[in-house]
Amino acid sequence: MESHHKWGIAFIAAGLALEILFPVLLVFDTILIVVGIALILFGGREKKIEGVS
């Protein structure tokens, strides 16, 4: 498992944990979850770009 996957899972877990513990922080939780999903989906793109050039 690559580091961006680990960080993505960590951000999603932190966002979900904060959502459960502190529902008032809805915006912050949502941002953490979105960043985690983006890391998982788009994290390995730089390797593909470097391989082309």
UniProtKB/Swiss-Prot annotation:
Keywords: Membrane, Transmembrane, Transmembrane helix
Organism of provenance: Archaeoglobus fulgidus (strain ATCC 49558 / DSM 4304 / JCM 9628 / NBRC 100126 / VC-16)
Subcellular location: Membrane
Membrane topology summary: Single-pass membrane protein
Protein name per the record: Uncharacterized protein AF_0870
Predominant location category: membrane
Transmembrane segments: 20-42
GO CC terms of this entry: membrane
Highest taxon of the lineage: Archaea
